[in-house]
């Protein structure tokens, strides 16, 4: 089964927090400690039959009357903290850091914006800048134990993701950027399709499991048009290697990001298109 999606996002960030928007921020020449904390408020909307809540923000209805029912639209407003503390070894152009990343913050991608990274950056002459980090999402994300439960109150369960991120910026002194992200997704209680009203066999229930691994590869080119405008086209490939064959999918994505510098502010607009194909047909539909 093939699925396509088009999404757009607009974010506005303060100038003091957006000086570094590359996959790997510039490493200072001087040794020592550095860091910053930026506070913001994010607002948006969510339509999902899988997500229950993000932190204290409810994102879905705990009861549905039909499997064909469209997901309700939920508006959300939540604080966003973008921070980093780092220690730099100036002589070797090495930096150790803990925090979340400015590039994710400006992409306005809720999933990656909330990730916290513990990592190391290394600048290598004529090669580029490389970043390796361990990533986790400290804010609890709850999903429905059985999202296919009809005319009953659906219970929620916590979903966690941990993984590794590797970035290579200014590849061979060009303006190309490469990223690979590998994650493991776990649920405390996975009960998809277990309702007796569905009449699914155990084998069919296993096809609906949402746990497993996700690999995402992205290649960008940072085109500096002039002092105020930058255009960043990109191509990506995502492989959802989930335990349920009906939930596993893979496919390619196209991205186009425009950055407009307004002095102390920077306006970021992002357009994405993704086309993915599932391994198996969902046994319910």
Stretches with model-predicted labels:
Residues 24-95:
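Outer-membrane beta-barrel initiation region
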Residues 29-37, 79, 92-94, 126-130, ...:
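Outer-envelope beta-barrel architecture signal
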Residues 37, 83-87, 118-122, 164-170, ...:
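Residues on the lipid-exposed face of transmembrane beta-strands in outer-membrane beta-barrel proteins
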Residues 41-47, 89, 100-106, 134-140, ...:
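Transmembrane beta-strands of outer-membrane beta-barrel pores
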Residues 42-58, 135-185, 270-285:
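Outer-membrane beta-barrel translocator/channel fold
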Residues 63, 67-75, 89-129:
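Surface-exposed loop and membrane-interface regions of Gram-negative outer-membrane beta-barrel proteins
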Residues 177-179, 210-281:
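Detector for outer-membrane/organellar transmembrane beta-barrel domains
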């Amino acid at each position: 089964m093939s699925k396509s999606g088009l999404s757009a996002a607009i974010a506005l960030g303060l100038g003091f927090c957006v000086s570094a928007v590359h996959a790997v921020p510039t490493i200072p020449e001087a040794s020592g400690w550095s860091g910053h904390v930026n506070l913001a408020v994010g607002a948006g909307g969510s339509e999902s039959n899988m997500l229950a809540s993000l932190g204290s923000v409810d994102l879905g209805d705990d009861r549905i009357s039909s499997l064909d029912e469209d997901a309700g639209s939920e508006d959300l407003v939540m604080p966003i903290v973008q921070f980093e503390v780092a220690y730099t070894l100036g002589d070797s152009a090495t930096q150790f850091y803990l925090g979340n990343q400015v590039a994710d913050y400006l992409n306005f991608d809720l999933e990656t914006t909330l990730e916290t990274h513990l990592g190391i950056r290394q600048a290598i002459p004529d090669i580029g800048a490389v970043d390796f980090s361990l990533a986790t999402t400290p804010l609890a994300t709850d999903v429905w134990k059985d999202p296919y439960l009809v005319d009953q109150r659906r219970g929620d369960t916590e979903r966690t993701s941990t993984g590794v991120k590797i970035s290579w910026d200014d590849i061979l002194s060009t303006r190309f950027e490469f990223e690979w992200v590998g994650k493991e997704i776990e649920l405390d209680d996975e009960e998809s399709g277990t309702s007796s009203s569905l009449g699914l066999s155990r084998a069919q229930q296993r096809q609906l499991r949402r746990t497993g691994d996700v690999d995402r590869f992205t290649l960008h080119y940072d085109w500096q048009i002039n002092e105020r405008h930058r255009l960043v086209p990109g191509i990506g490939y995502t492989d959802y290697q989930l335990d349920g064959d009906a939930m596993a999918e893979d496919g390619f994505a196209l991205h186009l990001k425009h950055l407009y510098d307004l002095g102390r502010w920077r306006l970021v607009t992002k357009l994405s298109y993704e086309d993915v194909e599932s391994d198996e047909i969902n046994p319910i539909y």
